């Protein structure tokens, strides 16, 4: 469809705004200023608010949040609480919250769920890392910013307001703040994102964009647009930019973090920089797109020319202050990331948090700050507690995770030199891909890699080239920021799309029902579809029910689009339209119910012991055991496991009621928060809420016991680290736990019998045997060393001459390590050693002044690989044949 839009609104007509075309960028805009010829936005106009505040009073960040919210609240917009900066809590297509509208996607914007309020106002903290390398340097860029927004959702049945009122509210807010209306321009523009599109206004004053007013009304399909039934007012006001413009500080950082910046400058002994220099830098940066320039040298050069200073001197002067600015921004970003429960890891949102953290630590090292990062983040938490008290409530976790991550960072840096040195032996240039791989795989920041290379180059004849681009972290962040949350395949098999009504799920009404009658609606391959069922279809981590339908075994149950597919052993027994009787294997169902409710109980216990940051990333509920994967920054200790078990079993003994109810999605989120999505994102406007009274609440479609006392004893069988930042617990319940404990007891009794001691003496006896074994191992190693020395002299006599070289081919007794030790002693100048043992192991080692490659040699006489001077592998021929092949190669 052809898109046309009239950008004229009621306000423009009533106040005699004029529509003009910018003399520089040629965009159309609306203004009250009859003399204006440019659109007002940078680079067509430069910042004119620096040193010249544009509002009647100066606003701090906290004050601006309140002012914005109160303004729209007084004008009929219901305030809505912010959502976490982890968008994965309610959607699976993005990791971080990048805009206020992201809070309402996809459910509200797609018309599947009604908005919690309409119209509404929200001040939503957002994180975007695509400009992370510009932060601190341009004066305006932030990784973490707050998008103030008023949203209205217009449908056929409920119309709120559209373009006229949206523009009117924006203009009224700016005038209330004291901004001169003649300085405000409304640039006509177009917005697209997340598959939606619509016309918009960019609202500009004094060279800076303060708001964007989007009218979302189209869906983009290929190169075309289709109208959507829900017309959405999607506005975005830059809260930080409003505060900055109201204060007129040289950069946005002084407006947000002035107290923290002063403390950091004093701590690091940063020399005083003339505010005019920073103001000039920010003003010129506003006229440039740093990424298009390529790096920051062009900006530096322009500032230096403007103020009449040598560019190198300027760089030396302001770089430390720019690091301070970046540290201030990054620590606020980390406060939200960790405060909202992100666990650092090497994947997804955990990777992004670690990237920001390690970049911050590196900057702190560069500028010489003696504060710990914990102290700086505490400053941030204190400064924000008035508007975000929930963040300081996570202080204990934040401090613990910072301790853990700082230790890991130090270990990474300490290992770094060896990793880089090994790489330089193989190549003469460290490329961008090398730097990214070193960062992704080893956690090595590029600056540290460069420092190591610079040191190596001082003493090495061969110089290694390296270039670290100014936008390195931006490149890395963009690669990871768009990672999608993993899609979990619900179906084991590819099931067909059927035009049938959804199957009535009887277990939602009564989980204890085991028999039912139903009508066969459809037969597909080995599956039958009924109008109703008590069989639970596999999903949500829980295994399917088993049983019989009309005496035929049900061996698999799956669901697609609300239709349940029952796989039976003999499909010939069924006909479409027939009535059938189904019977559940209730003992099997009961085991699944116990284990599923136990999953919720253990999850609650984990939060009590480890902290509120714990978040379920996966689960598997089977009849014999359950499995739960959760986020945590360290391995779970034995002490913590005991405490988790203790709390879980206390919950069982308390006999807490377990209730299941259906709730409106908005009501559930308002009452319980996003913690209900522990089991994953749940579609639809109605949620089934499973609540263990006073213990746990989750949106869950599984089958559960009615009281925790029905679970029986819970036993955690083992834990493992399945990936960085994710712990897996395996557990059993009821009789399953009894059997597991009995099996462990048998192991203890058998071990005690072998050692001839009572069970209570096992630890002490095992320790004594271990110490004795270590001593005996030392004695054996000494004897082996002496035998090796004797063997060395015996083998020296067996070397054979081939040209200028000497070669030894011999089969000896010993392990691979023992053969390696012998070869180390024998492979001296001009000698080649080939040793093999009885386990088909073979090694080739050479001394100095031997040109032939051992890697090439081993591939001729056996199978294996290695390096120029040493190769190992397997052999399958006789010693004599190996000798012949080796001699043949050496004679060539």
Swiss-Prot record:
CDD domains: AlaRS_core (cd00673). It is an enzyme of class 6 (ligase). It comes from Methanococcus vannielii (strain ATCC 35089 / DSM 1224 / JCM 13029 / OCM 148 / SB). The keyword tRNA-binding applies. One of its GO terms (cellular component) is cytoplasm. Consists of three domains; the N-terminal catalytic domain, the editing domain and the C-terminal C-Ala domain. The editing domain removes incorrectly charged amino acids, while the C-Ala domain, along with tRNA(Ala), serves as a bridge to cooperatively bring together the editing and aminoacylation centers thus stimulating deacylation of misacylated tRNAs. InterPro entries: aa-tRNA-synth_II/BPL/LPL, Ala-tRNA-lgiase_IIc, Ala-tRNA-ligase_IIc_anticod-bd, Ala-tRNA-synth_IIc_core, Ala-tRNA-synth_IIc_N, Ala-tRNA_lgiase_arc, Ala-tRNA_ligase, Thr/Ala-tRNA-synth_IIc_edit. HAMAP family: Ala_tRNA_synth_A (MF_00036_A). It catalyses: tRNA(Ala) + L-alanine + ATP = L-alanyl-tRNA(Ala) + AMP + diphosphate. SUPFAM superfamilies: Class II aaRS and biotin synthetases, Putative anticodon-binding domain of alanyl-tRNA synthetase (AlaRS), ThrRS/AlaRS common domain, Translation proteins. Keywords: Aminoacyl-tRNA synthetase, ATP-binding, Cytoplasm, Ligase, Metal-binding, Nucleotide-binding, Protein biosynthesis, RNA-binding, tRNA-binding, Zinc. This is Alanine--tRNA ligase. PANTHER family: ALANINE--TRNA LIGASE, CYTOPLASMIC, ALANYL-TRNA SYNTHETASE. It is found in: Cytoplasm. Its cofactor is Zn(2+). One of its GO terms (molecular function) is alanine-tRNA ligase activity.
């Amino acid at each position: 469809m052809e898109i046309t839009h009239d950008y004229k609104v009621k306000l423009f007509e009533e106040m005699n705004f004029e529509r003009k075309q910018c003399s520089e960028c040629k965009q159309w805009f609306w203004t009250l200023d009859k003399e204006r010829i440019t659109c007002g936005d940078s680079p067509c106009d430069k910042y004119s608010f620096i040193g010249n505040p544009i509002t009647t009073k100066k606003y701090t960040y906290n004050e601006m949040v309140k002012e914005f919210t109160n303004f729209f609240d007084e004008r009929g917009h219901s305030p809505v609480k912010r959502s976490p900066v982890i968008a994965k809590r309610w959607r699976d297509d993005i990791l971080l919250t990048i805009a206020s509208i992201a809070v309402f996607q996809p459910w509200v914007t797609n018309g599947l769920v009604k908005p919690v309020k309409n119209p509404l106002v929200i001040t939503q903290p957002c994180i975007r890392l695509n400009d992370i390398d510009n932060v601190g340097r341009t004066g305006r860029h932030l990784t973490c910013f707050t998008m103030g927004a008023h949203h209205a959702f217009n449908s056929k049945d409920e119309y709120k307001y559209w373009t006229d009122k949206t523009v009117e509210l924006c203009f009224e807010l700016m005038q209330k703040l004291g901004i001169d209306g003649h300085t405000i321009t409304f640039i006509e523009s177009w917005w697209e994102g997340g598959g939606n599109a619509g016309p918009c206004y960019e609202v500009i004053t004094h060279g800076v964009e303060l708001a964007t007013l989007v009218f979302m009304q189209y869906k983009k399909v290929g190169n075309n647009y289709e109208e959507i039934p829900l017309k959405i007012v999607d506005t975005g006001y830059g809260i930080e930019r409003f505060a900055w413009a109201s204060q007129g500080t040289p950069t946005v950082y002084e407006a947000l973090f002035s107290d923290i910046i002063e403390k950091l400058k004093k701590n690091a002994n940063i020399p005083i920089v003339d505010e005019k220099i920073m103001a000039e830098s920010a003003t010129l940066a506003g006229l440039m797109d740093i990424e298009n320039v390529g790096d920051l040298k062009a900006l530096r050069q322009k500032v230096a020319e403007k103020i009449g200073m040598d560019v190198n001197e300027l760089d030396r002067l302001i770089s430390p202050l720019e690091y301070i600015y970046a540290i201030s921004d990054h620590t606020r970003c980390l406060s939200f990331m960790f405060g909202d429960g992100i666990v650092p890891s090497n994947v997804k949102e955990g990777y992004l948090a670690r990237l920001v953290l390690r970049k911050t630590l590196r900057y702190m090292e560069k500028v010489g700050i003696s504060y710990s990062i914990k102290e700086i983040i505490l400053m941030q938490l204190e400064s924000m507690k008035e508007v975000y008290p929930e963040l300081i409530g996570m202080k204990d976790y934040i401090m613990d995770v910072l301790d853990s991550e700082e230790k890991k960072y130090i270990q990474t840096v300490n290992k770094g030199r060896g990793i880089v040195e090994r790489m330089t032996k193989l190549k003469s240039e460290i490329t961008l891909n090398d730097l990214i791989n070193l960062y992704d795989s080893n956690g090595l920041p590029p600056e540290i890699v460069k420092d190591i290379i610079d040191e190596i180059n001082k003493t090495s004849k061969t110089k290694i080239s390296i270039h670290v681009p100014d936008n390195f972290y931006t490149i890395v962040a963009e690669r990871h920021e768009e990672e999608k949350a993993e899609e979990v395949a619900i179906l084991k098999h590819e099931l067909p799309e059927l035009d049938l009504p959804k199957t009535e799920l009887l277990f939602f009404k009564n989980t204890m029902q085991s028999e039912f009658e139903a009508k066969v609606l459809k037969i597909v391959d080995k599956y039958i579809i009924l109008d109703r069922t008590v069989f639970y279809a596999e999903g949500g981590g829980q295994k399917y029910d088993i049983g019989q339908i009309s005496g035929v075994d049900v061996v698999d149950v799956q669901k697609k689009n609300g239709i349940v597919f029952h796989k039976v052993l003999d499909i010939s027994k069924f006909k479409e339209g027939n009535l059938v009787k189904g019977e559940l294997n209730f003992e099997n169902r009961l085991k699944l119910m116990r284990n599923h409710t136990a999953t919720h109980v253990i999850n609650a216990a984990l939060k009590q012991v480890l902290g509120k940051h714990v978040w379920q990333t996966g689960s598997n509920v089977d009849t014999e055991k359950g499995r739960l994967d959760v986020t945590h920054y360290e391995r779970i200790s034995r002490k913590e496991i005991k405490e988790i078990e203790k709390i879980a079993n206390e919950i069982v003994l308390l006999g807490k009621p377990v209730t299941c109810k259906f709730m409106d999605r908005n009501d559930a989120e308002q009452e319980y928060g996003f913690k209900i999505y522990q089991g994953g994102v749940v579609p639809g406007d109605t949620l089934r809420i499973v609540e263990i009274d006073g213990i746990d609440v989750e949106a869950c479609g599984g089958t559960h016991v009615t009281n925790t006392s029905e679970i029986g004893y819970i036993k955690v069988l083992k834990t493992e680290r399945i990936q960085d930042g994710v712990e897996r617990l395996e557990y059993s319940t009821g009789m399953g736990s009894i059997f597991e404990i009995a099996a462990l007891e048998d192991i203890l009794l058998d071990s005690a019998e072998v050692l001839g001691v009572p069970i209570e003496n096992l630890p002490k006896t095992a320790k004594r045997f271990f110490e004795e074994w270590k001593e005996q191992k030392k004695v054996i190693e000494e004897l082996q060393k002496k035998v090796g020395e004797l063997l060395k002299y015996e083998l020296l006599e067996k070397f054979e001459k081939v040209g200028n070289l000497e070669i030894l081919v011999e089969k000896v007794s010993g392990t691979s390590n023992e053969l390696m030790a012998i070869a180390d002693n024998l492979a001296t100048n001009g000698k080649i050693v080939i040793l093999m043992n009885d386990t088909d192991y073979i090694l080739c080692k050479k001394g100095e002044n031997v040109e032939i490659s051992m890697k090439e040699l081993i591939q001729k006489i056996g199978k294996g690989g290695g390096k120029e001077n040493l190769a190992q592998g397997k052999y399958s021929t006789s010693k004599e044949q190996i000798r012949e092949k080796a001699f043949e190669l050496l004679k060539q």
